[in-house]
Amino acid sequence: MVSVKKIVASALVGVLMFSAVGCNMVEKTQAAIDKTTVATVNGEKITLGEVDSHLKGVFAQMKSQYGDKYMDDPQVAQQILQQRQSVVQGLVTDKVLGIEADKLGIKPSEEEIKKKVDEQFENIKKGMGDNFDKALEAEGYTEDTFKDVIKNQVINQAVQDYIIKDVKVTDEDAQKYYDENKQQFVAKDSGVLTKHLLFENEEEAQKAYDEIQSGKTTFNDLFTKYQNNKSENKKPIAENLGVVPAENSGLVQEFVDGLKPLKEGEISKPIKTQFGYHIIQAGATYEKGAQLPFDEVKSQIIQILKQQKDSEKFKADMDQWKKDLNVKVYDDKLQEGLKISK
């Protein structure tokens, strides 16, 4: 927690304020620092207190490492300033996207938001197991305040999906990128070209596997269907991992064990890892240095270009919305309470 500044008696404060005009001799109270406006969005203020409320875990870590006077250390102060700058940009984004969600009529209903928040909260809690409560406390969140963070993410995602809904990457775009960047598509190690589908739960993965096995659909059909989901931060995800070596692939062991027995063109049954449930497809085997053909990496290129185009479209829309909403960020105010080296 941020250390509280020394509070001077009110009469003395009056004297000091009078005598120190223009000399910066008065030390602000923590309450005054917290009320400092560090940004405005459409006239709505964001205070330093709001920013610092998201940095409780950082402050606790700094205090543990450097002691109670950690904010007096110029190097630590610089780190905190950078953290504040990052948080205030996030809060600005939340407010801008929240306003635009209402304007565009795309904000999810309260019921939809609650359902998604509860689902994500439980998935995170389940994934972290016994460490969840400690991690929450270490970051300075309660369950309710953490759910507020997730709520903003749900709303933000709805707007992001709207922004990029018409972004397309053609086969011609992919071919052009391949021709201009062939050196990127050379096997770095000997191994198997590997693709996978990643599902949130076992039921979804098993259903997809059964439909592939029955001939109702194909792995490639599902891969095409889901290949843009990663850039939109939602599952199922379809991902081309490129050539995966037999050893030191950097992948989790369960995934590696599921890939090993597969022959070219075969798929695995759903495999559980810490990330969810995977259906893996083994492709051709390539030696180190081999040029990977366009058809084998087209989906990977499309993902690369889609992410680039999505980012460009999102930035362009955000820049315009910030201008329309007269967004202002006061970087100098983010230094309040810190001793920054000049």
UniProtKB/Swiss-Prot annotation:
A lipid is attached at residue 23 (N-palmitoyl cysteine). It catalyses: [protein]-peptidylproline (omega=180) = [protein]-peptidylproline (omega=0). The keyword Membrane applies. It is a lipid-anchor. The gene is prsA. A lipid is attached at residue 23 (S-diacylglycerol cysteine). Residues 1-22 form the signal peptide. InterPro entries: Foldase_PrsA, PPIase_dom_sf, PPIase_PpiC, PrsA_foldase, Trigger_fact/SurA_dom_sf. Its EC number is 5.2.1.8. It is an enzyme of class 5 (isomerase). This is Foldase protein PrsA. SUPFAM superfamilies: FKBP-like (SSF54534), Triger factor/SurA peptide-binding domain-like (SSF109998). Residues 189-284 form the PpiC domain. The keyword Signal applies.
